[in-house]
């Protein structure tokens, strides 16, 4: 008699998930190396090598520094009244005017850079009793000696240099930036030749601040034929405040003011070429895409940029745990469901069914559970980017030599921030990966439990992700299980009958083994009894003597 399990009265249904031959290794909270079917790289590690001029307005400084453009160096006149989102200073920038220094260079550079404009308004300062528009052979404007266009070099008139006292109120509703300077002659002779007094003095004040500078006369290294220097200073005058300038010599006077603006403009040193392209994020190495949450191209950035981290690679799992299919198995030879391994070749879904019935074998994806997993995973990358992308710029820090300790402290703080963000990135990605794997495992379990609840006593869990269905289940029946319309009551009697027949036959087949074992045991027992009886009989007849020695 044929077993019911071996004819067309039963079917097998397995549930499984997608797998690939070679997955991607990711890190989770509980495992440093776990293989998944798919993962997305989160660290941008290369730039385009060029700076894109859109959507940010890029101003190429060419051979001018921002401060030279601010002061009005003759070869930087093209930058007058320019505006920018990002001013790019080049490595070949140089000065071509009277040698100068800015005691608070970094602050002035940062202030002007963030303002994003060199808009200049000339004002009518009155300088009585002195000669204006001084020039130098170190600052040629064409063939003639010249000077910074935004500054006015005042010298003696005849043999006198009177005390100057000039006021300029700010009657506007915006801040005004005044640039002025103090000339340090190289010799006492030069001092008296230019300013009469043996020692000058310059005081610039507002209601909020006051600066008094006394020239430091002395020879310095020769630069462009000059051993004297000019020190550049700056003063911000708030609305309603007044600028007061008092001097008896050595004054490099302002010609007007720069209109200050507040914004997100900045400055960056870079030798990358500027090209016509679109990129939200700019680094000194060039523009980089901002579709990843992290980057390790450069610490210095401008725009909406990924967060800088030390890692070269961080992979976000965008697929499920990968368990490659055992290639030695056939479709339904000895294969198992998801508990043992995944299935390769499922191109239309992440989860699905394989079946074997009277009509043959087949496979189909479960789109609902697949879509549920995909919907939750798709938002992960955007959420990570939202958490990490900076909508502001990280400017480069500059300090003078005397501020070495501050520079060291700043470097320590920046390095610590990078270390913290690198650690945070590791933890964040590991947590997201753990959640993804748990999520995809959960969807598989949900589908399995949903199928179990439908089949009830009509099928038996085989323990490997498959069900043995104890009734005839054609393709239409299999489809009803997949789409959730299966009615177990229709097949209940048939399933119970087949189950009892199969179990009964299996039980009868099992009795043969028990009978064999029991028969063998009884035979051994009887043999022992006969042997013992023979020995006792022989002892009584005297044919066998047994001596016991103590």
Swiss-Prot record:
GO terms for cellular component: host cell plasma membrane; membrane; viral envelope; virion membrane. Residues 536-550 are cytoplasmic. Palmitoylated. A lipid is attached at residues 539, 546, 549 (S-palmitoyl cysteine). One of its GO terms (biological process) is fusion of virus membrane with host endosome membrane. Disulfide bonds join 14-466, 52-277, 64-76, 97-139, 281-305, 473-477. It comes from the Viruses. Keywords: Clathrin- and caveolin-independent endocytosis of virus by host, Clathrin-mediated endocytosis of virus by host, Disulfide bond, Fusion of virus membrane with host endosomal membrane, Fusion of virus membrane with host membrane, Glycoprotein, Hemagglutinin, Host cell membrane, Host membrane, Host-virus interaction, Lipoprotein, Membrane, Palmitate, Transmembrane, Transmembrane helix, Viral attachment to host cell, Viral envelope protein, Viral penetration into host cytoplasm, Virion, Virus endocytosis by host, Virus entry into host cell. One of its GO terms (molecular function) is host cell surface receptor binding. It is found in: Virion membrane; Host apical cell membrane. It holds the Pfam family Hemagglutinin. HAMAP family: INFV_HEMA. Binds to sialic acid-containing receptors on the cell surface, bringing about the attachment of the virus particle to the cell. This attachment induces virion internalization either through clathrin-dependent endocytosis or through clathrin- and caveolin-independent pathway. Plays a major role in the determination of host range restriction and virulence. Class I viral fusion protein. Responsible for penetration of the virus into the cell cytoplasm by mediating the fusion of the membrane of the endocytosed virus particle with the endosomal membrane. Major glycoprotein, comprises over 80% of the envelope proteins present in virus particle. The extent of infection into host organism is determined by HA. Influenza viruses bud from the apical surface of polarized epithelial cells (e.g. bronchial epithelial cells) into lumen of lungs and are therefore usually pneumotropic. The reason is that HA is cleaved by tryptase clara which is restricted to lungs. However, HAs of H5 and H7 pantropic avian viruses subtypes can be cleaved by furin and subtilisin-type enzymes, allowing the virus to grow in other organs than lungs. This is Hemagglutinin. It comes from Influenza A virus (strain A/Duck/Hong Kong/7/1975 H3N2).
């Amino acid at each position: 008699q044929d077993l019911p399990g071996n004819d067309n009265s039963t079917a097998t249904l397995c549930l499984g998930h997608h797998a690939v031959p070679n997955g991607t290794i990711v890190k989770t909270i509980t495992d440093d190396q776990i293989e998944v079917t798919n993962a997305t790289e989160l660290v941008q590690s290369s730039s385009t090598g060029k700076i894109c001029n859109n959507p940010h307005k890029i101003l190429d400084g060419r051979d001018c520094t921002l401060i030279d453009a601010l002061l009005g160096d003759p070869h930087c006149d093209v930058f007058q009244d320019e505006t920018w989102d990002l001013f790019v200073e080049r490595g070949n920038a140089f000065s071509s005017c009277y040698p100068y220094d800015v005691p608070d260079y970094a602050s002035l550079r940062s202030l002007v850079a963030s303002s994003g404009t060199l808009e200049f308004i000339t004002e009518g300062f009155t300088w009585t009793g002195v000669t204006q528009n001084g020039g130098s052979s170190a600052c040629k404007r064409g063939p003639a000696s010249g000077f910074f266009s935004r500054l006015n070099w005042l010298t003696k008139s005849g043999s006198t240099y009177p005390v100057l006292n000039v006021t300029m109120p700010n009657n506007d509703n915006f801040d005004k930036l005044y640039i002025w300077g103090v000339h340090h002659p190289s010799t006492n002779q030069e001092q008296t030749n230019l300013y009469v007094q043996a020692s000058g003095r310059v005081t610039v004040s507002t209601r909020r601040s006051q600066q008094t500078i006394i020239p430091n006369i002395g020879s310095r290294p020769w630069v462009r034929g000059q051993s004297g220097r000019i020190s550049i200073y700056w003063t911000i005058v708030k609305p309603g405040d007044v600028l007061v300038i008092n001097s008896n010599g050595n004054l490099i006077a302002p010609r007007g003011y720069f209109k200050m603006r507040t914004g997100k403009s900045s400055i960056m040193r870079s030798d990358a070429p500027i090209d016509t392209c679109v990129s939200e994020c700019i680094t000194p190495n060039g523009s980089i895409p901002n579709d990843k949450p992290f980057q390790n191209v450069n610490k210095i950035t401008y725009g909406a940029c990924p967060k800088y981290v030390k890692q070269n690679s961080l992979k976000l799992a965008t697929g499920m745990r990968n368990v490659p299919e055992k290639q030695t198995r056939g479709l339904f030879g000895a294969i198992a469901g998801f508990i043992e391994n995944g299935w390769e070749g499922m191109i239309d879904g992440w989860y699905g069914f394989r079946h074997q019935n009277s009509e043959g074998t087949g496979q189909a994806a479960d789109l609902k559970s697949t879509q549920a997993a995909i919907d939750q995973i798709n938002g992960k990358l955007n959420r990570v980017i939202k958490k990490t992308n900076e909508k502001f710029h990280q400017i480069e820090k500059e300090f003078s030599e005397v501020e070495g300790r501050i520079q060291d402290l700043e470097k320590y703080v920046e390095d610590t921030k990078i270390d913290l963000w690198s650690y945070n990135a590791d933890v964040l990605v590991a947590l997201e990966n753990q959640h993804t794997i748990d999520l995809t495992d959960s969807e598989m379990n949900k589908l399995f439990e949903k199928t179990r609840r439908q089949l009830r006593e009509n099928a038996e869990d085989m323990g490997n992700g498959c069900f043995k269905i104890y009734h005839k289940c054609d393709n239409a029946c299999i489809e009803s299980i997949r789409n959730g319309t299966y009615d177990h009551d229709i097949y209940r009697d048939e399933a119970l009958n087949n189950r009892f027949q199969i179990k009964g036959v299996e039980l009868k087949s099992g009795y043969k083994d028990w009978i064999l074992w029991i028969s063998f045991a009884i035979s051994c027992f009887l043999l022992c009894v006969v042997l013992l009886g023979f020995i006792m009989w022989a002892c009584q007849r005297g044919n066998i003597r047994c001596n016991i020695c103590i």
